[in-house]
């Protein structure tokens, strides 16, 4: 497979920065935070409604941790199609959690909300490399 290059945006923070990437979820544009420390890709419980209906969720018996919060309730959803550039991920089973704390912080910074977090499950599977200098996510 040839390399696929996807532009990323560096959002400057007081104490560092966040990496943001635009992908497609079921054909619609989605804005995700790239988090190499996140074990899996997750979507916000409110924002995912832009991509699929709530009846597509099922309760997840496991509590999720991370993203600067304590344990949180989660749901599972199946996304028919995630597009990372030319890569198509079909029937992706994802965790849906409350990311409102991230979006409230983004709102205070006058930034658009994120739809989810692109985690290391997808990054690793597709051998992703982040080129900070060129502001690119490279999929091999």
Where in this protein do the model-derived segments appear?
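Pepsin/retropepsin-fold aspartyl endopeptidases
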Residues: 1-140
């Amino acid at each position: 497979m040839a390399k696929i290059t996807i532009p990323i945006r560096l959002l400057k923070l007081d104490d560092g920065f966040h990496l943001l990437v635009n992908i497609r979820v079921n054909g619609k544009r989605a804005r995700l935070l790239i988090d190499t420390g996140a074990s899996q890709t997750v979507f916000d419980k409110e924002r995912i409604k832009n991509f699929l209906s709530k009846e597509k969720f099922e309760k997840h018996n496991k509590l999720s941790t991370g993203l600067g919060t304590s344990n949180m309730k989660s749901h599972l959803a199946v996304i028919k199609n995630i597009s990372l550039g030319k890569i198509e991920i079909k029937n992706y089973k994802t965790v849906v959690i409350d990311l409102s704390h991230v979006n409230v912080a983004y709102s205070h910074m006058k930034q658009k909300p994120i739809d989810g977090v692109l985690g290391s499950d997808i990054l690793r599977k597709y051998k992703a490399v982040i080129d900070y200098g060129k502001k690119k996510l490279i999929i091999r």
